[in-house]
Each structure stands twice: as C-alpha cells, then as structure tokens.
Amino acid sequence: MEVAQPKDLKEDFVLAKRRHAELVRQKRIFNARNRIIGGDTTAWDAQVCDQNIKAATEKARDEAFAAEMRQNDKIACLSENRERRDRKNLCKAINDFQQSFQRPETRREFDLSDPLALKKDRPARQSDYDARNTISGMQKFMGEDLNFHLRKKFQEEQNREWSLQQQKEQMIGRENQKCAEDLYLKTRLQFDETAKHLQNLETATRKAVCATVKEFNKNQALESAEKKIQERKQEQEDNLAEISNMLRGDLLSENPQQAASSFGPHRVVPDRWKGMSQEQLEEIRLVQRQQVQEKLRLQEEERQRDMDWDRRRIQKARATLLFEQQQQRLQRGLRRALDCSNLSLAREQLLQKKHMKELCTNHATEDYFTQFNTGSR
C-alpha cells in the first residue's frame, strides 16, 4: 500500500488545478456566442436569478399585503355592523326607557288640572324677528329659521337647475368632441388617401427609373462586350507580332555580338548577355584554384598559430595552478597561526572576565552613568 506524501498531494493538486483551468479555457474559447459577442453569461444568469428572486419576493409581499387588506376590510365591516347594531339597540333602549319611565304625566311641569296647558301655551317665537328671540334665549340657530323648508326647497330646485345645466354643458361638450373626432377622422382619411396616392406615384416613378436603368445597363453591357471583343482581337494581333519578332530577333538566336556595349570591351548589356566564353571560364577556374591554394595555406598558418597559443595557454595555466597551490599552503599556515593566536586571546579574555567578575561585585550607581555624555563632543 502506497502512502501519499505531502509532495505527491501538492503535485496532484497542481495537476487538478491545471486540468480545471484547461477545461474552463476550452469552454470559454469553444463557445462561439461568448467569444464573438463577449457577454458575461455568469453575470447575466446571476442578474436573472436576482430579478426572479426580487419578483417572487415582491409578489409574496403584495399577496401578504392584499391578504392583510382583505382581513382588515372584513374586520372593519364586522366592526361597523356591530357598531350600527349597538347604536340601534341603544336608541331602542332609550326609547323604551323614555316610554316606560319618562312619560309626560310624570314630569314636574305637568299640571293635573290642565294637562293641555303646554300645548295651549304660545310658542317661544312667532317669527324669525320676534323681540323675544334674544341671543341669550337660544331659540334660533343657523339653519333653524321658520323659512327653513322653503329655503331648502329653493336650494334643491337651484341644485337641480345647476345639475341640468351641467348635464346640458356636458352633452354639448360630448357633441363638440364627437364633431372634432369626426373631423379628425375625416382629415386622417384624406391624409391617408394623399399618402397612398403619393406612394403609388413613387412606385410608378421607381419602376420607370428601374426600367431606364435596366435599358442603360443593357446598352453598357453590349458596349462592354463589343469593346472586349475588339481588345481580344487587338491582343491576339499584338501577340502574333511579338512572337514573330521574338523568332526573328537576336534573343532566341543567341548572337554573342548583341551583348557588346558601346562603353568598351569590358562592358556588356545585361539583358542581352548570354554567358561567358570558354577562355573566360578557364581563366576564372584558374583564379579559383589559386584562391583555394591560398586559403589552404592561410588555414595551415592559422592552425600552427592556434597550436602555439594553446601550448602557451597550457603552460600559463600550469604555472597559475602551482602558484595557487603555494598560496593555499601559505594561507593554511597563516590560518593555523591566527587560530592559535585567537585561542590564546580567548583564554586571556576568559581569565580577565573571571577576574573582573570577582573584582567588580558592586552594581553601577546613577553617578556612574551621569559622567558620560556631559559635553557636545
């Protein structure tokens, strides 16, 4: 059974990390949409998820609010019904109590001799401007005048007239709005007909232009074809003339005199020169053999010179090695002498420390430290 070492675990972790990075890179490169568009799908998915969560949260909150509102409405309706029922029961109880225990014959001001005395008595006021109707008497309040019913009827009639007038104005406004809408619709239809007519004219004009352009292109194509035929014919004639000139010229006949230059016998015309003669080639080969021999001689001299330098370098390296060995021996001797000297000095220092430890047994006082740094230098 193999035991996993920390080094092996680290290598496995590095390999797994590389494989994961390679897979991520392949997924990023081979995805044409992300590579071309450059969109961050991870961020988009996160945004969509956040939006869905937000929408679900808002929906749940709205549903909770709606349920709470329905519950509150139900409670309010129940409370209102209970309050209305309690008020009705209270009014009924008050009426029952008044009819049972507060009858007119049980009042203090009831006269047994004349039970209708209060009904025969004059009212508190005869009119709205009665002299007995003082401020302190509190017999007249706003809205409690004797002409209240007539005034209320007049106000109702006035409100009815105002309502009829408003209805009439609203009807006139609706008729005016309908007329305006009809006029707008009629104008819109006229505009549509005009636009359709203009579009038809534009279509006809475009067709005429297309036909003209087509005819022009056809003529241009015919002219171009005719021109190409003439150019091809002229090119064939030029090619035949060129072939005839080439066959009769000095280029294919390889006349050596055509390369002679007017600047001297040592100059030639490059575009007419057909090569060197046998004498020139032999002269070049002779010069090449001489150059080869000269190069061999120089190489031999260079080899001898390199051997001489190698021999000198070896001798110098041997002398340097001997000198370094001698210096190392001298350094070892000096090192041994220095070690002996350091050993003796260490022993002396140890003895001195031991002596000072035995001699100086008192601790340093504050006066000892104040004697230092007393000046600027």
Swiss-Prot record:
Domain of life: Eukaryota
GO CC annotation terms, alphabetical: axonemal A tubule inner sheath; axonemal microtubule; sperm flagellum
UniProt entry tagged with the keyword Cytoplasm: yes
Keyword Nuclease: no
Coiled coil: 217-250, 282-308
Self-association and partners: Microtubule inner protein component of sperm flagellar doublet microtubules.
Protein name per Swiss-Prot or TrEMBL: RIB43A-like with coiled-coils protein 2
